């Protein structure tokens, strides 16, 4: 009778793993810098793919995400307005379409409103408006 260990032996370099190009990757806890570089690569790829992002200008990650959201919404609108899709929606009545305003538009509107509110003479504003704007 042969003695064997209850613990499975681990082979470090399996031929099948090498031939398939499979390698054990480190977890983000093992290498936090690789995770950071990977995220930066993802942001760079998003910057390349979204046509409204200026390529020759440095933009923040937040701006990239806002452009991506706007682009997705624009694609959704284009898809929803495609004749084939429109005819499918007419076949299924009773479903409402929720249209969203892009975040950049909302942010711009809020900025404009706050600037306009600061230009009003204080005697024209109610106490509620002063609390909201001030």
From Swiss-Prot:
Major location category of this protein: cytoplasm
Which GO BP terms apply?
A: adipose tissue development; adult locomotory behavior; astrocyte differentiation; B cell differentiation; bundle of His development; cell maturation; cell morphogenesis involved in neuron differentiation; cellular response to lithium ion
Q: What highest taxon heads this organism's lineage?
A: Eukaryota
Cell location: Cytoplasm; Nucleus
Q: Record's Gene Ontology CC terms?
A: cytoplasm; cytosol; euchromatin; nucleus; protein-containing complex
Drop me one GO molecular function for this one.
RNA polymerase II-specific DNA-binding transcription factor binding
InterPro entries referenced in this protein's UniProt entry, alphabetically: bHLH_dom (IPR011598), DNA-bd_prot-inh (IPR026052), HLH_DNA-bd_sf (IPR036638)
Q: Which parts of the sequence form the motif Nuclear export signal?
A: 106-115
TM stretches of this protein: none
Residues that bear Phosphoserine: 14, 25
All residue ranges annotated as the bHLH domain in the record: 23-75
Cytoplasm is among the record's keywords: yes
PTM summary from the entry reads:
Ubiquitinated in a ASB4-depedent manner, leading to proteasomal degradation.
Q: What keywords tag this UniProt record?
A: Biological rhythms, Cytoplasm, Developmental protein, Nucleus, Phosphoprotein, Repressor, Transcription, Transcription regulation, Ubl conjugation
> Per the record's keyword annotation, is Repressor included, yes or no?
yes
Q: What does this protein do?
A: Transcriptional regulator (lacking a basic DNA binding domain) which negatively regulates the basic helix-loop-helix (bHLH) transcription factors by forming heterodimers and inhibiting their DNA binding and transcriptional activity. Implicated in regulating a variety of cellular processes, including cellular growth, senescence, differentiation, apoptosis, angiogenesis, and neoplastic transformation. Inhibits skeletal muscle and cardiac myocyte differentiation. Regulates the circadian clock by repressing the transcriptional activator activity of the CLOCK-BMAL1 heterodimer.
The free-text domain remark for this protein reads: The bHLH domain is essential for its repressor activity towards the CLOCK-BMAL1 heterodimer.
Q: How does it assemble?
A: Interacts with GATA4 and NKX2-5. Interacts with NR0B2. Interacts with CLOCK and BMAL1. Interacts with IFI204. Interacts with NEDD9/HEF1. Interacts with ASB4; this interaction promotes ID2 proteasomal degradation.
This protein is called DNA-binding protein inhibitor ID-2
**What species was this sequence derived from?**
Sus scrofa
The taxonomy runs: Eukaryota, Metazoa, Chordata, Craniata, Vertebrata
């Amino acid at each position: 009778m042969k003695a064997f260990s209850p613990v499975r032996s681990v082979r470090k370099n399996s031929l099948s793993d090498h031939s398939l190009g499979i390698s054990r990757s480190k977890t983000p806890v093992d290498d936090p810098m690789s995770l950071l570089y990977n995220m930066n690569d993802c942001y760079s790829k998003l910057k390349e793919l979204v046509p409204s992002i200026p390529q020759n200008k440095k933009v923040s990650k937040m701006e990239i995400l806002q452009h991506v959201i706007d682009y997705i919404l624009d694609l959704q609108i284009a898809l929803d307005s495609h004749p084939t899709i429109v005819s499918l929606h007419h076949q299924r009545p009773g479903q409402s379409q929720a249209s969203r305003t892009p975040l950049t538009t909302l942010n711009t509107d809020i900025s404009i409103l706050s600037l306009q509110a600061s230009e009003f003479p204080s005697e024209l504003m109610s106490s509620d408006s002063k609390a909201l704007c001030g």
